[in-house]
């Protein structure tokens, strides 16, 4: 599994955006499904656009998520486990983001 922390990719740092980890992709897909459920019917093409994946990759990840019992596919929706994953992932990501700000912000040239 890759890193859970995103690197700032603004033009100021000039770094390319790192590839997303599988957990980030799962979170993006599950989050897109959650948003679509609020609006009504969940359409795969809208999940594809919101999760920024090619359709063949989206199909593969949907199969993985169904196998892990995080989604239902007919109709497309979240299971309790999928909702729990999103809550836990968001909590962990928030914690890691806070740590990055606390320990890494402004450290360039500062006291060690």
Question: Residue ranges of each PLM-predicted region?
Answer:
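Short acidic, hydrophobic short linear motifs in intrinsically disordered regions
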Residues: 38-50
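A short, conserved structural fragment
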Residues: 66-77
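Short, cationic-aromatic polyanion-contact patches
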Residues: 15-26, 43, 76-95
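Short amphipathic alpha-helical interaction segments
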Residues: 52-67
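Secretory targeting signatures
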Residues: 1-2, 29
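Short amphipathic alpha-helical interface segments
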Residues: 23-40
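Amphipathic alpha-helical dimerization/coiled-coil segments
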Residues: 2-14, 91-112
């Amino acid at each position: 599994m890759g890193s859970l922390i995103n690197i700032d990719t603004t033009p100021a740092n000039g770094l390319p955006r790192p590839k997303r980890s599988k957990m980030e992709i799962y979170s993006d897909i599950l989050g897109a499904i959650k948003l679509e459920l609020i609006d009504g019917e969940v359409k795969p093409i809208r999940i594809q656009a919101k999760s920024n994946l090619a359709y063949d990759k989206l199909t593969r990840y949907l199969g993985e998520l169904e196998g892990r019992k995080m989604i239902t596919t007919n109709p497309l929706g979240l299971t309790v486990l999928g909702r729990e994953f999103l809550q836990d992932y968001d909590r962990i990501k928030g914690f890691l983001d806070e740590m990055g700000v606390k320990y890494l912000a402004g450290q360039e040239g500062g006291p060690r």
